[in-house]
């Protein structure tokens, strides 16, 4: 059926991250993981030709679909013109104000996975079932002292619990991408540790992972253009050596928060 739709509208995909999921079992599993009911308002980002949209509409009470490509917007409108539960929002998800939703289910455009994810974390929702490039998903769920531990890992841990629940081969898509994909279950929650200023903490995480091979002492000083702390060298000198002699990849999220809190307090009192 999916291949017939592609042929009908003359859509080949392959550009602008257009790799359409055509494996019926994978599509069904993604929707099952969302545990949808008529009470749910679902956001789908990148509706494509509507193969996931169709399944969401069968179970959810309301579905918002954001789609950038005008040709695909036309397909969605044509396929679901009689379905009152669907609202199609044409445009760039990074530039749009998101509607209110409680669940997000999407095959995200891989080239902008990071900014989309961080934008979602700024909104309240109960559950996300999100498909990413497999390597990106690995970095999302990575722990400290592992190869994939990164800014993305820390920020994800700050906002939510995240687990890889499915791994999907290239053959499940048309056209097949060059990489494997993964579905990540994201459950937002309050942070498990305190931050004096959340944005300052996120900026510090960015700063130290930009210099991830440097010891933290040097990484913070080098990344101070993101922190704008006038007396940064003096403050860093007062931080515990057990932290400063390590690299960012060796510190747990709560330890990075302790460092951010100390610097923020010292900056505020100087």
Swiss-Prot record:
Entry superkingdom: Archaea
Pfam families: RrnaAD
Compartment list: Cytoplasm
Key words, A-Z: Cytoplasm, Methyltransferase, RNA-binding, rRNA processing, S-adenosyl-L-methionine, Transferase
MF (Gene Ontology): RNA binding; rRNA (adenine-N6,N6-)-dimethyltransferase activity
Main location: cytoplasm
Annotated SMART domains: rADc
UniProt cross-references to SUPFAM superfamilies, sorted A to Z: S-adenosyl-L-methionine-dependent methyltransferases (SSF53335)
Binding-site residues, S-adenosyl-L-methionine: 19, 21, 46, 67, 92, 107
Signal peptide (residue range): none
GO cellular component, one term: cytoplasm
EC numbers, comma separated: 2.1.1.-
Function: Specifically dimethylates two adjacent adenosines in the loop of a conserved hairpin near the 3'-end of 16S rRNA in the 30S particle. May play a critical role in biogenesis of 30S subunits.
NCBIfam families: ksgA
Family recorded in the similarity comment: Belongs to the class I-like SAM-binding methyltransferase superfamily. rRNA adenine N(6)-methyltransferase family. RsmA subfamily.
Protein name (database record): Probable ribosomal RNA small subunit methyltransferase A
Source organism (scientific name): Methanococcoides burtonii (strain DSM 6242 / NBRC 107633 / OCM 468 / ACE-M)
């Amino acid at each position: 059926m999916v291949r017939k739709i592609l042929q009908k509208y003359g859509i080949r995909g392959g550009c602008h991250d257009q790799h359409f999921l055509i494996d019926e079992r994978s599509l069904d599993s993604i929707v099952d993981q969302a545990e949808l009911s008529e009470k749910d308002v679902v956001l789908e980002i990148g509706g494509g030709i509507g193969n996931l949209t169709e399944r969401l509409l069968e179970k959810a009470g309301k579905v918002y679909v954001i789609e950038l490509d005008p040709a695909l917007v036309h397909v969605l409108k044509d396929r679901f013109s009689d379905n009152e539960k669907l609202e199609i929002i044409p445009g760039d998800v990074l530039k749009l104000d998101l509607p209110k939703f409680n669940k997000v289910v999407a095959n995200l455009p891989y080239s902008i996975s990071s900014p989309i994810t961080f934008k979602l974390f700024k909104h309240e929702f109960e559950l996300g079932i999100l498909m990413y490039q497999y390597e990106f998903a690995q970095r999302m769920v990575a722990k400290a002292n592992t190869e994939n531990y990164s800014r993305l890992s820390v920020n994800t841990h700050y906002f939510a619990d995240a687990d890889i629940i499915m791994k999907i081969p290239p053959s499940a898509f048309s056209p097949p991408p060059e990489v494997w994909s993964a579905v990540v279950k994201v459950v937002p929650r309050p942070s498990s540790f305190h931050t004096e200023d959340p944005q300052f903490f996120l900026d510090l995480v960015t700063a130290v992972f930009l210099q991830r091979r440097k010891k933290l002492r040097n990484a913070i000083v080098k990344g101070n253009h993101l922190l704008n702390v006038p007396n940064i060298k003096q403050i860093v000198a007062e931080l515990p050596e057990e932290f400063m002699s390590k690299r960012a990849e060796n510190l747990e999220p709560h330890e990075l928060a302790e460092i951010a809190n100390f610097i923020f307090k010292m900056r505020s009192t100087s």
